Regions:
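Long, ordered, helix-rich scaffold segments
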Residues: 370-371, 401, 487, 500, ...
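Glycine/proline-rich low-complexity spacer/linker segments in large multi-domain proteins
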Residues: 25-28, 108, 117-167, 215-222, ...
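A surface-exposed beta-strand-loop module
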Residues: 72-135, 191-193, 531-541
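Beta-strand-rich binding/interaction modules
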Residues: 75-81, 456-457, 467-549
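Surface-exposed beta-strand/loop patches in extracellular or lumenal glycoproteins
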Residues: 54-72, 167-173, 489-511
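Hydrophobic alpha-helical and helix-loop surface patches within well-folded domains
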Residues: 75, 199, 227-499, 627, ...
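Hydrophobic helix-coil surface modules that form long, contiguous segments used
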Residues: 51, 143-148, 155-318, 347-350, ...
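N-terminal, polar/Ser/Thr-rich
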Residues: 17-50, 136-139, 160, 457
């Protein structure tokens, strides 16, 4: 074509003679890519870029149109080359980034190549697609293509099922370094101060796993690992090599642990891990052979590193490196099965850390995550794990807590049910069957069935394909001469005020633990009906307690009928492991929220276990108290404060603001949760004043506060802070050169209670000398009192926020703004939210689901307050 065509996602009418319908969602399979050859000229610091792409294709059926994806690319010319001829093609742009490449006559079946020359723009705002950032005076260029933004870098078949080799050449300034998925083959000088960097042909990859990075990087050698001695490197912005020491030390251990589990060598020729100065809406990306991380996750100055930061870093690294097998070597066929990537990586991360660092007790963190997933899953508007993708916006919505956290919890349940060895054989079989190819849920379940020697897939599917959490009612009847019988009844757990139906049936693998003399015994059954009984094996004596969720691994809530909750609390709790105890406490909180347990029993349980030695148990009780605090009227806040002081005050003061030599990791992790609870809600003047003193000292001396407590101290100081302190925080925000410090300062800025200061903090989002992408958490206030301030700001600046702040995964930023109102609790507020967003969210991909969940949360809060507040008041009155 002689003129450029800007592909901006606008809808153009097809010529009247066209016989080919525009795809509604997925590309047709008449033409499939076989290989990509990409040639890009990338100049960090300059927005325009030039590209050529040759796509070798297999034309399976005669067609006059080849459908591909492109977004914001200027197509300059398109030709189709067959073994016998070369044909010029026209490019027609359609909605949803679809482009029809049209030939004058139908293309015959067989091999051919599409040759496209084009231009595009490198974004300075987004952190997906091709984007660039200036850091310490240098420009760096990166890519992040999952799920649907490879099409902003090159025209391509941008769906995960199209998995092919890629051969990439980059033309970049001669003084810069360039990286991609495959090893570099050569560098050749070119005119104009450029060089051509050629990379080896990659293994078969979908477009979303292709990766590029260009800039004045430093490279840290992390050694070699695994059976094949894979070279490992950490790629960092210039001058930050020392901050990669921990990541470099941990990488070989993680790779080798994963190789042992999978019984498959690391699949790629190298593993680079690249630090990106700033990311929004993502923390890391599992590009094959070249993982990208937000620098705050991967890098830390050695003198500021702590166990808390190391836990976060190693956990994310294990997640991303496990993707090299689960997601990259075997790739989901379509986005409805993204759980096969993300849920497995989340589960494997915990499993690997249990092997590498058993002292971290990440199995308990997994139990906490399971409860978090159930709290999200209580909504009728919640997605299913394997949610059908019906419109493009559903793709981005699939990357949520249901996919990651519920998915990993369900995997953990079936591993516990089948046994770790059987489950591992199923995983290994799945990888062996589908290496370098695509797979879906049915493929994984077939491998699991083979390994188990029985039908597991139908059980697993009942959790994949329907939303919600099972609620299992349990009772036991004991006869004088017969074995005890357990009575189970299942329904969907719903919170108070929900308009959903409880009539859901799962196929639940239930592993029950019961008393057996002074020990405990396990028995597993499969519950497939609404009501089901089974006999306790091996004993005719009535148990002194039963517990329905061995290891806390089951993805279900439990309600103990009759005397069995009291018996469990009195007789069973001392014999249970911490995961099981944690599950009972979390179920207690959920039953209270569901109106199935009174305030005295629920809050009394939290007080009883507030002094537990394990931080996870303590944090679970804090969660119950915090939920009650949301419903406590102002006149009873002093009572709540005295309860908090009596339950947690002594421990908070004992921990204090200064870590002690030789203290446990649990103490370090508990301190940031306990200190603000007691200092603020517990009205502990001494703790609050010390936190304020330390925060003020930190503004002058960054060594004055333990690194793990900086955000806590700044938030406490801001709680009753004045304009003078606010202005000091803003001044330091502008002065600081370290992203981690700026994030800590923002945690303070969102904690002011003065509405005028809260408003001033929000207005920083439009300050031209600040990075707005670092300030988005200001839209999720720490305080109930300032939620209306945020809401008014969102209503007044909706369009400006959408224009100023980057979206992610093809979803505009404004699609997330309904979530800023999720903490509201009255009918009037709900109506205001619905009225404001009506007509707005329908136009934004992904927006309607966020609005639905927010409206449902507000409605539930209305009902919960009316039903539970009297019981909470009654419980608090004696304090």
């Amino acid at each position: 074509m002689s003129r450029g065509l800007w592909l901006l996602g606008l809808l153009y009418l097809l010529p009247a003679h066209s016989q080919t319908a525009v795809p509604k969602l997925r590309l047709p399979d008449a033409v499939q890519p076989v290989r990509y050859v990409v040639d890009l000229k990338l100049l960090p610091g300059e927005d325009p870029f030039e590209g050529r792409i040759d796509i070798e294709v297999d034309v399976r059926r005669p067609t006059s149109v080849i459908w591909i994806h492109a977004n914001a690319l200027e197509i300059q010319s398109v030709h189709f080359q067959s073994p016998s001829s070369t044909t010029a093609m026209n490019a027609d742009a359609h909605e949803n980034d679809l482009v029809g490449l049209r030939s004058p006559a139908p293309l015959p079946p067989g091999r051919g190549s599409i040759h496209i020359s084009y231009r595009g723009q490198v974004s300075r705002i987004l952190t997906d697609g091709l984007f660039q950032q200036r850091y310490n005076g240098d420009w760096y260029l990166f890519s992040k293509f999952e799920p649907v933004t490879a099409r902003r870098a090159f025209p391509c078949f941008d769906e995960p099922s199209f998995k092919t080799p890629w051969r990439i050449t980059l033309h970049v300034p001669e003084k810069l370094r360039a990286f991609s998925n495959a090893p570099m083959m050569s560098e050749e000088p070119e005119s104009g101060g450029l060089k051509a960097v050629k990379f080896a042909e990659s293994k078969p990859l979908p477009s979303y796993l292709v990766a590029l990075a260009v800039g004045p990087f430093d490279v840290v050698d992390a050694g070699k690992a695994g059976r094949n001695g894979v070279p490992l490197r950490i790629i960092v912005p210039r001058g930050r090599a020392a901050e990669a020491a921990s990541a470099a030390a941990q990488s070989p251990k993680i790779v080798e642990a994963l190789e042992r589990y999978f019984a498959v060598p690391f699949p790629y020729e190298k593993l680079d891990q690249v630090a990106v100065p700033l990311t929004t809406a993502w923390g890391a990306m599992e590009n094959a052979g070249m993982i990208a991380y937000g620098s705050s996750l991967l890098l830390t100055p050695p003198q500021q590193d702590t166990e808390v930061r190391e836990r976060d870093r190693v956990s994310v690294m294990a997640h991303e490196i496990s993707h090299q097998w689960f997601g990259d070597l075997v790739t989901t066929a379509w986005w409805n099965d993204i759980w096969l990537n993300e849920a497995f990586a989340s589960w494997l991360s915990s499993k690997m850390l249990m092997e590498l660092r058993p002292d971290w007790k990440v199995n308990l963190d997994a139990a906490v995550s399971r409860n978090s997933a159930m709290n999200s899953d209580k909504l009728v508007s919640a997605r299913t794990i394997r949610q059908p993708i019906e419109v493009p916006g559903d793709i981005a919505n699939a990357f949520d807590g249901i996919t990651y956290v519920k998915g990993s919890a369900v995997i953990r349940m079936f591993e516990n049910y089948l046994g770790a060895g059987v489950f591992q054989r199923g995983v290994q079989l799945f990888l062996a069957r589908h290496a370098w190819k695509n797979a879906d849920a049915n493929d994984f379940l077939a491998a699991l069935n083979t390994a188990a020697g029985k039908d597991v897939g139908s059980l697993f599917s009942s959790f994949l394909n329907q939303g919600g959490t099972p609620l299992l009612h349990i009772d036991v009847s004991c006869g004088a001469k017969s074995a005890p019988v357990v009575h189970l009844r299942q329904e969907r757990y719903l919170p108070l005020g929900s308009e959903g139906s409880t009539q859901s049936i799962w196929k639940i693998p239930v592993c029950l633990t019961r008393s057996a003399g002074t020990a405990a015994e396990r028995q597993c059954v499969t519950v497939t009906r609404q009501s089901q009984d089974f006999v306790l094996e091996g004993s005719k004596e009535c148990p002194s307690w039963v517990m329905s969720n061995q290891n806390g691994a089951g993805y279900y809530r439990t309600a103990y009928d009759g005397p069995w909750l009291a018996k469990l609390m009195r007789n069973g709790m001392p014999q249970l492991n911490t995961s099981e105890q944690l599950g009972i406490l979390n179920d207690t909180s959920a039953l209270f929220s569901g109106g199935l347990l009174n305030a005295a029993d629920a809050l009394g349980t939290s007080v009883r276990f507030a002094g537990d030695p394990d931080r996870h148990i303590v944090q679970a009780t804090i969660g119950m108290i915090a939920a009650a605090a949301e419903l406590t009227p102002p006149e009873y806040r002093p009572n709540l404060g005295r309860l908090i002081q009596s339950a947690y005050g002594a421990r908070a003061r004992s921990l204090g603001w200064s870590p002690k030599s030789g203290e446990s990791g649990d103490d370090r992790l508990l301190r940031p949760a306990l200190l603000p609870l007691v200092a603020i809600s517990g009205a502990d003047t001494a703790l609050r004043d010390e936190g304020t003193r330390l925060a003020t000292a930190w503004l002058d001396d960054r060594q004055a506060v333990d690194p793990d407590l900086v955000a806590t101290a700044l938030s406490i100081a801001a709680w009753n802070g004045d304009k003078v302190f606010f202005n000091r925080l803003v001044a330091e925000l502008r002065r600081s050169k370290l992203q981690r410090e700026r994030i800590q300062i923002v945690s303070g800025l969102k904690s002011f209670g003065d509405p005028a200061l809260a408003r001033s903090a929000l207005e920083l989002l439009f300050a031209r000398d600040l990075e707005p992408r670092e300030l988005t958490s200001l839209l999720t206030p720490s305080r109930k009192e300032t939620r209306p301030v945020v809401w008014d700001f969102v209503k007044s600046h909706f369009d400006e926020l959408n224009a100023r702040l980057p979206g992610a995964r093809g979803i505009p930023f404004a699609a997330q703004l309904p979530l800023t109102a999720a903490g509201f609790c009255t009918e009037q507020q709900r109506r205001d939210v619905e009225s404001f967003f009506s007509g707005r969210m329908e136009k934004l991909k992904g927006g309607m689901r966020n609005l639905a969940s927010t409206v449902e949360n507000i409605r539930l809060c209305e009902k919960r307050t009316a039903a539970l507040q009297p019981g909470i008041i009654s419980f608090l009155k004696p304090y």
